[in-house]
Structure formats: structure tokens, C-alpha cells
Amino acid sequence: VVQKDRRTALGIAAAAAGLAAAGVSEGVSAPEVRRHTAEIENLPPALEGFEFVQLSDLHASALLTEPWSRAVVERVNALRPKLILITGDFVDGTVERRERDVAPFADLRAEYGVWGCEGNHEHYGDYEAWMRKIEALGIRVLRNAHTVLEVKNPEGKSAQLCLAGLCDPMAARFGREMPNLEKTFAGAPASREALRILMAHQPKFFPKYCAQASFALQLSGHTHGGQIWGMDEAVAIINGGFVRGFYRRSGALMYVHPGTGLWNGFPIRLGAASEIALIRLTRKQP
């Protein structure tokens, strides 16, 4: 009986080790491109079929180093996106230690630029140093701010896209600027005049933001898509019920990105793959 129990224990240990190894391997692999369609109410005709890339939770670290970052950039640029949006958690570590690992992101290319918002992890390190470094890479971080892009379709018709980014609520712990939708959209074109896209790292505040401002699409990350199959319920509890994919509230749509990278403090993915999201806009039918 003792021998049988020992064999059983060894078998369980071996299976657990195998799953852990598979999870780490999946977690650190270069993410695949996944295509999604966002159905937007009252989408301007000139933006029908407009595609952009969303990255999130890159978490450049001692685990996800320069070769991984380079692979992500190559896959994104191969899509020739019109626009690249990065919804926070760029890095883990100091600028000095991670400078080489984030360097490839300077090579991201898109006709209408590369834009981002901060995540909670930016606040754990030298926040201002990282904001300067990310901007130096050519990624314009919108902190309670917006910009207006004049987007043209292949037929030459144009429409305004109002792109906004919120500060992250983690700022409260460090006495930094909190998310402020009123400030973010101050002076912005009305939602009937421009398509408003809001970048906000944490998805759980989506209903609150919908009540405070008018926008068509919110892009978030943070949850890593649950990271392990079967953890959806636990992840949903601490994230307002949002885990990954599309959600609709009050006429607005949100996409929760499952993450392009992952945090090196828990470097395992099983059944919740990372991704490079290629999102196509289309008008929602009545």
C-alpha cells in the first residue's frame, strides 16, 4: 500500500510539474494574432472596416526580454495597422534594468500613431522615469487626456476619431493623479461628431465610466483573461464581472484584452492564451 501511495504521489507530482512547465512555456511564447469585430452603434460610414491593433499588459521583465519584445513588434508591424493602442502595464522593473527589453517597441509603426494609457504596474516603479521612457519610444501616453485623429478611408472619406486615455486608480496609493473623465474629455468633440474610444486599463469601472461620459468603445486589459482555465469566476469577482472579450453597457462596448505578455510573479498560462488583438470596426445593426 505504501509503495502504491508513493507511486501515486510521484505521478501527481510529475503531472503537476508537466502542467507547470507547459504553462510557463505558453506564457512566455510570442502571442498569436487574433481578429475581432467590434460592433459600434452609429459608427460613422467612413470608419466602417477600420482596423487597429490593441496590445495590453506587455510586462517587459527578466522573463519577457528583448527577443520576446522584438517578436511582438515584428508580428504587429506585419499587419500594417492603421493605429496601435496599448492599454497599460508596459513593464516590470527599473528603467536601467529593462531599457534594452523595451527598446524594440520604438519600432512599432502605424499610420495614425502608437498611443497608450498607463496601467497599475507603472505606479510600482519609478513612474515619471517610465512615462518619459515610454514617450521616448514614440508611444504617446494619454493621461486623463484625449487627442483627435482625422481618419480617411480608402475612398478618401474622412471621420474624426477621438482617442482618450485615463490615469489608473492605483495612482491613489501613491498620491498621483486619479482617473478623471471630465478632464479627459474636456474640449473634445461631442460623441455625435466623433467616434470616442476610451483606453482604461482596469475594466471593472466600465459601468461607472459609462454613467459619467459618452463614448462608443472602451479598451481595457489587466485581467490577463483569467490566465488559467477555470479561474474565470475568481477573476470576475475582483474585476466587476469582466474577464475577457466584449461586453456592452448603456450603448457602449468594451473589449477586455487577455494580455500580450504576463506578470513574471505568476508566469503561467493554461487555456487563456495571450494575444495581439486586431480589431475591426463595423456598424451595429438595429
Task: Describe the role of every protein-language-model region.
Residues L43-P286:
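Soluble catalytic domains of enzymes that build or remodel membrane lipids, polysaccharides, and related
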Residues A16-A20:
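Hydrophobic core of alpha-helical transmembrane segments in multi-pass integral membrane proteins
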Residues V2-A15:
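N-terminal secretory signal peptides and thylakoid transit peptides that target proteins
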Residues G11, A21-F50, L63-P67, E74:
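C-terminal segment of N-terminal export signals and the immediately downstream linker at the start
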